[in-house]
A protein has these predicted regions:
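Residue-level detector of alpha-helix initiation sites
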Residues: 12-15, 38, 112-114, 134, ...
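A Rossmann-like FAD-binding core segment of flavoenzymes
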Residues: 30, 75-95, 101, 168-262
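Beta1-alpha1 glycine-rich phosphate/pyrophosphate-binding loop at the start
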Residues: 1-77, 164-185
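Cysteine/selenocysteine-centered motifs that mediate thiol-based redox chemistry or coordinate metal-sulfur cofactors
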Residues: 139, 389-415
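Mid-to-C-terminal Rossmann-like scaffold of FAD/NAD(P)H-dependent oxidoreductases
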Residues: 1-4, 10, 23, 280-377, ...
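FAD-site-proximal beta/loop scaffold in flavoenzymes
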Residues: 123-145, 216-225, 230-303
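Rossmann-like NAD(P)H-binding beta-loop-alpha module
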Residues: 138-186, 221
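FAD-binding core/adjacent interface of flavoenzyme oxidoreductases
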Residues: 1-6, 62-150, 225-229, 238-240, ...
Length: 415
C-alpha cells in the first residue's frame, strides 16, 4: 500500500514540489493537494502581464485540473477546501467544508499574505493588495471605473503593479519611504536610473513619504494624507509593502514557529511527519519572498520524500530582476560593500547603462547591472561558487567570454 502524502497549498512552492515528485518518485505516494483558489496551479510570477493585459489566465495556467487527474493526484481547490485544522495525533487534516483526509506525511506550503499598513482608512473600499488572480481581477475592474491610483511601496511588486495600472490607462503615483525605488535591491545610482526611466513612462512618485491616513468618501478611498501635510488623490490604493508568512495553521497544531514555521535543512518541522517549504517557513533565521529559493527548497524536499538521499537546503544569494517590459536590471549579493571592498564601475548615461561589481578578498561579493544585464548569470555563478578572481580581475567587468578566453590562455601557457 502506498503512503499518503498531503500537501497544503497549491502555489509556487507546493506545485514545484509536485513537479519534482513526479520525476523522482511518481508511484511512491497517494497524493492529495488542498488549495484555497478555485484553479489548478498558475504562474504567480506572470500576474504583472496579466494585469497589463499582455496575458490571459489560460496563458499563465501551468497545471490545470486535467494535469492532476493525469498524474493520479487528488486536488481539492477553492475557499471551502482551505485546511482549518491539523490533527497531529490522528494524522489527518480537516478542510473548511468538513473534508477530512489522513496523511502519513504532510507538507505545509501555505505561503504568505500581503502586509497591510495599519493606518486609518486601510479598510476602505478600493484599498487592496496585488497577490493573486482575484486581486488582479479587482484591480482591472477598478481601473475600468476610476482614473487615479496610488501604489504604496516601490519594491518589485509595487512597481509591477504601478506599470500594469498605467498600462490600463490610470494615472499612477508610487508612494515610497525611501528616495529611490527598489532601495533594497539597487544602489543609489541604479535606483536613480530606474526612477528616471519610470518617470519618462508616465509614473509619478512621492518619495521619502510618511503615509498617515487613507481618506475616504462614502466608504470609498479618495486619497492619501502624509505627515508633511500633503495629499495625493487616489480612488484605488494598492498596498505592496511586504508579506507575512501564513503560520497560523502550523501554530494551531503546536508546531514551532517564530516569524515563519521553523524547519531543518531537510525542510522538516519539529514533527518528523510534517514538512514545510516556501514563503511560510523560517530556515536558519531567514524567511523568503522570491521564487528561486522556493524552487531550491522543493528540490531538496522531493529528494528527501523520495528517499534518494539526504539533500540539504542552503540559502544562496538571490538575484533581482524587474518584470517591466523594456527595463533591464539585475542585482545580487552585497552590492553596497564596505571599506574592505573594491569597486569596479562602468557608467554610460547616454546609453542608460550602469554596472557595478563589488569585490572582496579577490572574490565577487555583489553586483548591480542596469540597462545591460546579459552577464547577470555569469556574476551569479561567480558569487555562488566563490570563484577566485585573481587571474581574471582585469576582465571580469567585461563578462564571461573574455574571462574564459583569459583562463584558456593561462592554461595553454602552463601546459
Amino acid at each position: 500500500m502506498k503512503s499518503k502524502l498531503v500537501i497544503i497549498g497549491n502555489g509556487m512552492a507546493g506545485a514545484k514540489l509536485l513537479e519534482e515528485l513526479m520525476v523522482s518518485c511518481p508511484q511512491q505516494y497517494d497524493i492529495t493537494v488542498f488549495g484555497d483558489e478555485p484553479y489548478g496551479h498558475y504562474n504567480r510570477i506572470m500576474l504583472s502581464p496579466l494585469l497589463a493585459g499582455e496575458k490571459t489566465l489560460d496563458d499563465i495556467m501551468v497545471m490545470d485540473r486535467v494535469w492532476y487527474e493525469r498524474h493520479g493526484i487528488v486536488l481539492y481547490a477553492g475557499a471551502e477546501k482551505a485546511i482549518v485544522r491539523i490533527d497531529r495525533l490522528r494524522k489527518q487534516v480537516t478542510a473548511k467544508d468538513g473534508t477530512v483526509t489522513a496523511y502519513d506525511r504532510l507538507v505545509i506550503a501555505t505561503g504568505s499574505r500581503p502586509f497591510i499598513l495599519p493606518i486609518p482608512g486601510c479598510d476602505l473600499e478600493g484599498v487592496m493588495s496585488f497577490r493573486d488572480v482575484a486581486d488582479v481581477e479587482n484591480m482591472i475592474a477598478a481601473a475600468n471605473e476610476h482614473k487615479k491610483a496610488a501604489v504604496i511601496g516601490a519594491g518589485l511588486l509595487g512597481l509591477e503593479a504601478a506599470m500594469g495600472l498605467k498600462d490600463r490607462g490610470m494615472e499612477v503615483t508610487v508612494i515610497h519611504n525611501s528616495d529611490i525605488p527598489l532601495n533594497r535591491q539597487l544602489d543609489q545610482t541604479a535606483g536613480e536610473f530606474l526612477k528616471d526611466e519610470l518617470l519618462s513612462r508616465g509614473l509619478k512618485f512621492k518619495m521619502n513619504a510618511d503615509t498617515q491616513t487613507l481618506v475616504g468618501d462614502n466608504d470609498r478611498v479618495r486619497g492619501i494624507e502624509f505627515g508633511d501635510g500633503s495629499f495625493v488623490e487616489a480612488d484605488l490604493v494598492i498596498m505592496a509593502i511586504g508579506i507575512k508568512p501564513n503560520i497560523e495553521l502550523a501554530q494551531s497544531c503546536g508546531l514551532l514557529c517564530e516569524r515563519g514555521i521553523i524547519v531543518s535543512d531537510t525542510l522538516q518541522t519539529y514533527d518528523p511527519s510534517i514538512y514545510a517549504l516556501g514563503e511560510c517557513i523560517q530556515h536558519r533565521g531567514d524567511t523568503f519572498g522570491l521564487v528561486a529559493p522556493l524552487y531550491d527548497q522543493a528540490k531538496v524536499l522531493a529528494n528527501h520524500l523520495s528517499e534518494h538521499g539526504v539533500a540539504q537546503y542552503q540559502t544562496l544569494p538571490t538575484a533581482t530582476k524587474l518584470k517591466v517590459t523594456g527595463i533591464h536590471l539585475f542585482s545580487v549579493g552585497d552590492f553596497i560593500g564596505d571599506d574592505d571592498c573594491e569597486f569596479l564601475i562602468y557608467r554610460d548615461d547616454s546609453a542608460g547603462i550602469y554596472k557595478k561589481l563589488v569585490l572582496k578578498n579577490n572574490r565577487l561579493a555583489g553586483a548591480v547591472l542596469y540597462g545591460a544585464t546579459e552577464e547577470g548569470a555569469f556574476y551569479n555563478e561567480l558569487l555562488d561558487n566563490k570563484t577566485d578572481l585573481v587571474d581574471i580581475r582585469p576582465f571580469v567587468m567585461f563578462g564571461r567570454a573574455l574571462c574564459e578566453n583569459r583562463l584558456a590562455e593561462l592554461s595553454t601557457v602552463n601546459e
